């Protein structure tokens, strides 16, 4: 690489759009297929393309850790976010595919893992989860009711997992999905 080694690649492309969701007063037949394609393009190809570019340097140096950001929405169908959930599920599949592809063809120094954040309160989703007065929206209340930690995560709470996956402390870990969600995925009523 022109700028030195590339030891870690974090593929964090992500996003959704209203037209790729199914609003409460709509049905799946109202889903805008072009909007879903755009969401898949952003989330899936926003992971595939950087990998294809940066993995070449990792192959040459025989080491590197690729971490793909998936989502809780990939693990269980969440209401309204059909396109986003499908795209992030594909990111998990891509992660598992690349784990074998790289390790078998280029050696054990190349690792690929994914992280599935749960509901983290960020600027991107704040308007969906909080009212202007700071109280929780009905959707947010439902999420919190199904999260054993009874709160949203903070973006900084992903850092420990990312640091571990990027480091040699996880050098025998590849093809895995680490869920960071306060117990949301594991909890049922």
Language-model-detected regions and their locations in the chain:
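Catalytic Tyr-X3-Lys loop
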Residues: 7, 29-48, 63, 67, ...
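Conserved mid-core segment of classical short-chain dehydrogenase/reductases
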Residues: 16-37, 60, 80-83
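A glycine/serine/threonine-rich, flexible loop-to-helix segment
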Residues: 23-26, 105-106, 119-146, 187-189
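Amphipathic alpha-helical dimer-interface segment in Rossmann-like NAD(P)H-dependent oxidoreductases
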Residues: 38-60, 99-100, 104, 167
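Active-site helix of classical SDR
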Residues: 51, 87, 95
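Residue(s) in the substrate-gating loop at a strand-loop-helix junction
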Residues: 71
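Short C-terminal tail/terminal secondary-structure segment
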Residues: 76, 162-163, 174-189
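Short, small/polar-rich loop/turn modules that mediate ligand/substrate recognition or access, typified
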Residues: 106, 111, 173-175
